[in-house]
């Protein structure tokens, strides 16, 4: 059995060294965008939970601060790589009534809960900005839910 010619002995290592950066780029890209999708699902579900708790028939209705607390509690699973973890920005409109006499007055009207979150990329943030002009780091993820009062 003949061995490899002397010129071919290091070819596999060189080929692997050439392809390794592309494989790592794909691997980390899949991981990074998986985390972005996870965070998007978290804020979408958080806005739904906030709206659902706000429109449920209770007397007195939840206040804006209580609805924001529901969204904040649901958002604790967000993944961030920033030095200081970003806090989601929560907007509730219209402002729920605060008096007991107005409990049923909003029946059928909509309550909007909006959540936005700034995701900082771990690896690809500034790299993608070179290739895509509309890409920004941090990436702002947002979700809005509208539900009618019961």
Explain the meaning of each model-derived region:
Residues 48-150:
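Short, conserved structural patches
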Residues 2-73:
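Alpha-helical assembly-interface signal, strongest on the long, hydrophobic N-terminal helix that forms
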Residues 1-2, 150:
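Absolute protein N-terminus
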């Amino acid at each position: 059995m003949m061995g490899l010619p002397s010129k071919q002995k290091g070819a596999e290592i060189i080929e692997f060294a050439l392809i390794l950066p592309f494989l790592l780029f794909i691997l980390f890209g899949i991981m990074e965008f998986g985390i972005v999708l996870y965070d998007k699902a978290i804020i979408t579900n958080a806005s739904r939970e906030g709206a659902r708790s706000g429109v449920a028939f209770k007397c007195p209705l939840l206040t804006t601060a209580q609805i924001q607390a529901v969204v904040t509690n649901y958002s604790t699973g967000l993944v961030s790589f920033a030095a200081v973890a970003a806090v989601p920005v929560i907007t509730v409109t219209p402002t729920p009534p605060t008096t007991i006499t107005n409990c049923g007055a909003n029946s059928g009207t909509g309550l909007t809960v909006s959540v936005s979150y700034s995701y900082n990329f771990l690896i690809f943030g500034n790299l993608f900005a070179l290739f895509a002009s509309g890409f920004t780091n941090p990436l702002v993820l947002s979700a809005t839910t509208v539900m009618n009062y019961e």
